[in-house]
Each structure stands twice: as C-alpha cells, then as structure tokens.
A protein has these predicted regions:
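Extended polysaccharide-engagement surfaces of secreted carbohydrate-active enzymes
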Residues: 319-375
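Low-complexity, Ser/Thr/Pro/Gly-enriched N-terminal "stalk/linker" regions
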Residues: 30-100, 124-132
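Aromatic-lined, polymer-binding surfaces characteristic
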Residues: 97-98, 106-111, 122-321
Length: 375
C-alpha cells in the first residue's frame, strides 16, 4: 500500500504542468530553495531522496499555491507572467481559474490520499477542493463553469484533469459529495466530455471524463469513448513514441506515455481490456531508449513544446511499474526522476513569490506557448 501511495504521489507531482501565481494586496514572502533534509544515501546513493522527501517536495510546491488561499471561495487564479501567455481577455479568465484548480490538484490528490487531514495556510485542503468542485456546477459560485457551447476548448482539458484526480483520491474528493452534487458536476463534465475535441493528446481528456463517469455508474457515449481511444493508439509510431499531430517531443512522454498507462490502470483494464493492454505494451517500448533522453546525472534537456512543464517529462518512469517487467532498472529511473525534480526545486530562479515561473528555470518566453498559463 505504501508503495502504491508513493507511486501515486510521484504521478501527481510529475504530472504538474506549472502552478499559477496570484496577485494579492499582501505580498507573499519569497520561498526558500527546496533542500533535501536528512538525505538517505543508503537508499538513494546519488540524490538521497526517499518517499518522505517526495512528499515534502509536493507539500513545498502546494504550500506556495495555498499561500494565496484564505477562504474556501478563493480561487487558484494568478496574474500572468510574460505577454504571450493567456489569459488575454476577460473571457479567458474563468478557464484560467479552472486550470489553476485542476493543475494544483494533480499534486494535492496523492497528498490527500496519503493524508486526508492535510492543512495548508490554515485551510483543510480536502475541504477546499471539494468546495471548488461543487462550485463548478453552481451558478451562484465564483467557480461556476457553464455547460459547453460550441467547439472544443481549454475547459475540456481541465475537466479531464479533474477526473484523473477525483479517481486518484476518490474517497476524499468524490465519495463525500451528495448525489445531487455529483449529478450536477457530472452533467457539466459530460457536456464537454461528449463534445468535440482535437485530434491530438486532447482526446485523452474526453476519455478521462467519460471513463470516470462510466466508472461511477453514469450513462456515457461509449462508442465515442472507444473511438477516441483507438484514435490515440493510432498515433503510435514505435519504440515508445507517439506523434502528437504532428510533433515528436516530450508530449509523447507527459501526455501519451503518462495518460495512456494511467487510463489503462484506473479504468481500461475493466472497461476496454484489449485497448488497455496495447497502451501498456507501447509503454514498455520506452524502456530501452527513454532514460537516455536524460543526462548522466539524471537531468533533462530544454527540448520541445511547453517545456515549462519541466519535470513532467519524467512522469512515465514511475508508471513502468504497471507493466511488472523484469527488464526495468527501478533504481536508475528513480535516480532520473529525483534528479530532474531537484534540477528545478534546488534552482533559485524556479520560484517567484512561492510558485514556479513561466520558463525553464526563471521566466523565459521561448520556453512557453500562447496557451501557457500560470495554472
């Protein structure tokens, strides 16, 4: 069980895209650089990082975001950094707030699974996220998201991300909601999950919404779910690499080779076992080459789109456990994951006012896209 919680936490931290930053009237003190307290070089000869240090790293990151949260109604919405990023108008603000909620929950969910009583900045973290989830479908809430109107949008991605976290910490985030609250939230999610998408990694977010709600007993468009899964698998090009319409970069890792195996483990083995097995087989193809994308000391290159996602590039490594293969050097991949995490957390430019910057180390416009948001 402890190993599973560690794996789930590793997934949560590695799936972190980039935390948002909020403008407050009261300035927040600059966070100190993360340090590994009492490293254990017997268990981890190179980094000293153990399970407990990974938990501390997650709390360190989440603490910065919660420095801006003082009530359950406060939203994870922060001023943009760099002109090219979004939001660029008032119409984009609601989804920017939703992105802040969804992306920070990628860290909070595994922490809550390990410690449901977690408190940050005087706020019970579980209460905060449940309150925000309920607010998504409440027209009177500042967190309200209306049902879909029109084509695919960023809202689809964030609701799909929430579905992952709600499954990962279901006993804390989803189960305590009333039936009416669940039904209302499900209706909002379905309006996007069953709606149009883009033929890239975006299809995963339709998949997670539909699979999660199917798992909870809701009627979903199963043919659309299966169709998106098959289209995602069709983008596989061999040796562990997917083509993301049309790019080859770390998206193959932090999207296809992360979301695919997570879907297989969370839902696929029960819902579509043959498709789940194919995702896991494709995952294993990475073992022979992907670790060599990192340096001898376990650090990553600045390569590809959305590089401000940073250590999300190591996300597939912790998921190789799903395959139960004997040819995986788990010590090596743990060393890579820990070294890449520390590559950023130990860099003094990584944080500004407690949260990550929009860049690789510090703010750096060439490392972000127009769809990048401090969320």
């Amino acid at each position: 069980m402890r190993r599973k919680v560690l794996r789930d936490f590793v997934i949560g931290v590695l799936l972190l895209f980039v935390l948002p930053l909020a403008e407050l009237s009261v300035a927040i003190a600059q966070e100190s650089v993360f340090t590994v307290q009492q490293p254990d070089f017997q268990k981890s000869p190179y980094t000293g990082m153990t399970r407990q240090h990974w938990i501390q790293a997650g709390e360190y990151l989440l603490k910065g975001a919660f420095g801006y949260i003082h009530t359950l109604d406060d939203q994870m919405y922060f001023p943009k950094q760099l002109d090219k990023t979004y939001p660029n108008n008032d119409g984009q603000v609601p989804v920017a707030k939703l992105e802040g909620l969804a992306r920070t929950l990628f860290i909070a969910a595994p922490l809550l699974k390990d410690n449901p009583e977690l408190v940050m900045n005087g706020i019970r973290v579980a209460d905060y996220y449940r309150h925000q989830l309920v607010g998504i479908s409440n027209p009177k809430s500042p967190s309200f998201i209306p049902h879909r109107k029109g084509g695919p949008s960023q809202t689809l991605l964030e609701l799909g991300s929430l579905a992952i976290s709600m499954k990962a910490a279901q006993a804390v985030l989803w189960d305590p909601l009333t039936k009416a609250q669940k039904d209302s939230l499900a209706a909002t999610m379905l309006s996007y999950g069953e709606g149009p998408t883009i033929g890239s990694n975006w299809m995963f977010f339709n998949v997670f919404i539909l699979s999660f709600l199917k798992d909870q007993g809701y009627a979903v468009n199963e043919s659309y779910l299966e169709s998106n899964l098959k289209k995602l698998l069709a983008r596989y090009r061999g040796e562990g690499w997917y083509n993301d319409a049309p790019a080859y970069d770390y998206y193959s890792a932090w999207a296809y080779q992360t979301y695919g195996p997570i879907w297989a483990e969370m839902f696929g083995k029960k819902q579509f076992p043959q498709l789940a097995q194919q995702f896991l087989a494709n995952q294993h193809d990475m073992v022979a080459n992907y670790p060599y994308m990192f340096s001898r000391d376990g650090k990553m290159n600045m390569w590809g789109r959305s590089i401000c996602y940073r250590f999300a590039a190591t996300a597939p490594l912790s998921l190789w456990e799903y395959d139960k293969s004997s040819d995986v050097n788990y010590g090596w991949i743990r060393r890579i994951a820990s070294s890449t995490l520390l590559q950023f957390l130990e860099n003094p430019k990584f944080l500004e006012e407690g949260v990550p910057t929009m860049g690789f180390y510090g703010p750096f416009a060439p490392a972000v896209q127009i769809y990048s948001c401090r969320g």
